[in-house]
Structure formats: structure tokens, C-alpha cells
Curated annotation (Swiss-Prot):
Pathway(s) the chain acts in: Pyrimidine metabolism; UMP biosynthesis via de novo pathway; UMP from orotate: step 1/2
Domain of life the protein comes from: Bacteria
Gene name linked to the record: pyrE
Taxonomy of the source species: Bacteria, Bacillati, Bacillota, Bacilli, Bacillales
Function: Catalyzes the transfer of a ribosyl phosphate group from 5-phosphoribose 1-diphosphate to orotate, leading to the formation of orotidine monophosphate (OMP).
Residues at which orotate binds: S126
Protein name in the entry: Orotate phosphoribosyltransferase
Entry's family note: Belongs to the purine/pyrimidine phosphoribosyltransferase family. PyrE subfamily.
Subunit structure: Homodimer.
Keywords recorded for this protein, A-Z: Glycosyltransferase, Magnesium, Pyrimidine biosynthesis, Transferase
């Protein structure tokens, strides 16, 4: 069984995926969605989070080769970055969405040096905006960001475009298309739900308006 399918099954089993076609979720970007994937719930399931950490570590080695630092995005990417950095025996930092307004005013917590190769860990990619803010902060600090590794991506056109424009490589363990296919095959959703989910993916910005 592929990693994509295994992770999709695990997210469904631990009820990290919520479906509400008639009462859609509203994302921070303003997009309305019939589905919400809450990967923070993986923290409560040791076997699932261990599998995710191991799979992310393998993906990073296969895709990016040797890196110097693992960076987690605040807040959801932090625990996964910690477990992955342990497995790879690498230093870890985390990146806030913006600099603190008190103390040292840091946006990046943890030591980072000019020229270090950094991989960013995200729990989820939607439009990609928050991930790219972390990439930008790290590059401004002098790091060389080799790419982003995430658990899940919705695979939205806007997110793909932003990543391509920034020249940032993305690898993920699973994705929206795989998730809804597994959900249908294992009776988490109906055929009618599936049509709604496919329609949303075609035009998420205008869906439900």
C-alpha cells in the first residue's frame, strides 16, 4: 500500500477529517470548504504521529538529500518538526507568522546561520501563503530553503501557483484527491458527497457563494 493511501486512511480513522457540505468551514483565507482536515489531532495518536514523522524524514532524505536544519511553522508544524529533527539528528527551529512584539522580537526561534540548508515542515498546505511567509523569513535570515515537506495538501491551483512562482519545492505524504477516494471506498462519504467534494476542488474561491 502506498504512503499516500496509508496516511489518508490514518487521518480518516482518527477522525481528523470533517465533512460539512451544508455548513461549510471558512478558512483564514476566506475560502469556504465542505471539508476540513485537522492534522493537529494526530498528536493524540502515538502510532499515527510516529508513522508520519518517519515518512516525512524518509521523504526529506529522498527528495532533498542532506539538510542542515529542520524548521517547523508555528504552531501546527512545530511538533512534527521536532520529531522529524530527532529522527534525522538535526537542529530544529520554528518560525512564527510574524515577529514577536515583545522580548527579542524574534520571528525565528532557534539558531540559524547564513547558508544553512533548511527544510520547512508544515502540517497542511491550502493556499500556501503561511508556508511561504516562513520560507521568506528564513531566507531573509540567510538560510537556503530547499523546500517544504507537509503531511497533506488540498492541491489547490492557487497554492500550486504561489509555490511555483516562489520556486519552492513541495513534497507531501498525502493529498486531497487520495483522501476523498479512500473516504469513498471505505464508506466515510457517499457518492453525493463525492460530487460535492469534486465540485469544490474545481473552483474553491467561488464555491458556496
Amino acid at each position: 500500500m502506498s504512503i499516500e493511501k496509508q496516511v489518508a486512511e490514518q487521518l480518516l480513522e482518527i477522525k481528523a477529517v470533517f465533512l460539512k457540505p451544508n455548513e461549510p468551514f471558512t478558512w483564514a483565507s476566506g475560502i469556504k470548504s465542505p471539508i476540513y482536515c485537522d492534522n493537529r489531532l494526530t498528536l493524540g495518536f502515538p502510532k499515527v504521529r510516529q508513522f508520519i514523522a518517519k515518512s516525512l524524514a524518509e521523504k526529506i532524505k529522498q527528495t532533498f538529500g542532506e539538510v542542515d536544519v529542520v524548521a517547523g511553522t508555528a504552531t501546527a508544524g512545530i511538533p512534527h518538526a521536532a520529531w522529524v529533527s530527532d529522527l534525522l539528528d538535526l537542529p530544529m527551529v520554528y518560525v512564527r507568522s510574524k515577529a514577536k512584539e515583545h522580548g527579542k522580537g524574534n520571528q525565528i526561534e532557534g539558531p540559524i546561520s547564513k547558508g544553512q540548508k533548511v527544510v520547512v515542515i508544515e502540517d497542511l498546505i491550502s493556499t500556501g501563503g503561511s508556508s511561504l511567509k516562513a520560507v521568506e523569513a528564513l531566507e531573509e535570515a540567510g538560510a537556503e530553503v530547499v523546500g517544504i515537506a507537509a503531511i497533506f495538501t488540498y492541491g489547490l491551483a492557487k497554492g500550486k501557483q504561489l509555490l511555483e512562482e516562489s520556486g519552492t519545492k513541495l513534497v507531501t505524504l498525502t493529498n486531497y484527491d487520495e483522501l476523498i477516494e479512500v473516504a469513498l471506498n471505505e464508506n466515510y462519504v457517499t457518492g453525493e458527497d463525492m460530487e460535492t467534494l469534486k465540485e469544490w476542488k474545481k473552483n474553491p474561491e467561488n464555491w458556496g457563494k
